[in-house]
Design a protein with these regions (language model features):
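Histidine-/acidic-rich catalytic cores in large beta-rich domains
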Residues: 1-178
Length: 178
């Protein structure tokens, strides 16, 4: 089977709970990449909509056998969009892999976290990347035979303070974390 991402608009009431990101960068806000034809000047500079991903498992015959709406699994208090990224997608994923136990592991570039998604409960089983363990723009997570996780941390806009606040500094750095 194959897991694909299906884009879906988040319920407007749930959208109000989502924190962080660049104000006005929602779909239909002042984000020209999403909301305006080439060469036209944006006219609507208000807040637009936020979309999510629905992880969808398909058989080789394109039969849907499992779905998980990530916006229902995320916690708006914990899963905050990083300050210098857009608010058009919550979360934005850049990789996903199946673990030996059947659960899924992925990274979110705009939440700067690693997630293990529990396929049975459709909830976040584990997240990494906050506070003193802060990572930034991670990708390519893999579960190892010993149960550990290995991933790549781009280190972009990494926070200078140990509690993971908003003191961002250059230069970017890269590292592999286990």
């Amino acid at each position: 089977n194959t897991i694909v991402n299906i884009v879906k608009k988040i319920d407007p009431e749930r959208q109000k709970l989502i924190k962080g990101g660049l104000p006005g960068s929602e779909v239909g806000g002042n984000n020209p990449a999403w909301s305006h034809k080439a060469g036209e000047r944006p006219t609507d500079l208000g807040q637009g909509d936020i979309y999510t991903l629905v992880l969808t498992e398909l058989t080789p015959d394109n039969e849907v056998v499992w779905e998980m709406d990530l916006s229902e699994a995320l916690d708006p208090e914990l899963d905050v969009i990083t300050p210098l990224t857009g608010r058009s997608l919550w979360p934005g994923l850049n990789s996903i892999d199946e673990l030996p136990d059947g659960n899924l592991i992925s990274t979110s570039y705009n939440l700067s976290q690693v997630y293990i998604w529990d396929k049975e409960t459709k909830k976040v089983k584990w997240r990494f990347g906050q506070g003193k363990d802060r990572i930034s723009f991670p990708h390519d997570p893999h579960g190892l035979e010993n149960g550990n996780v290995i991933l790549f941390d781009n280190g972009r806009f990494h926070s200078a303070d140990p509690d993971g606040g908003t003191n961002f500094f250059p230069p970017d750095f890269s590292r592999v974390i286990e």
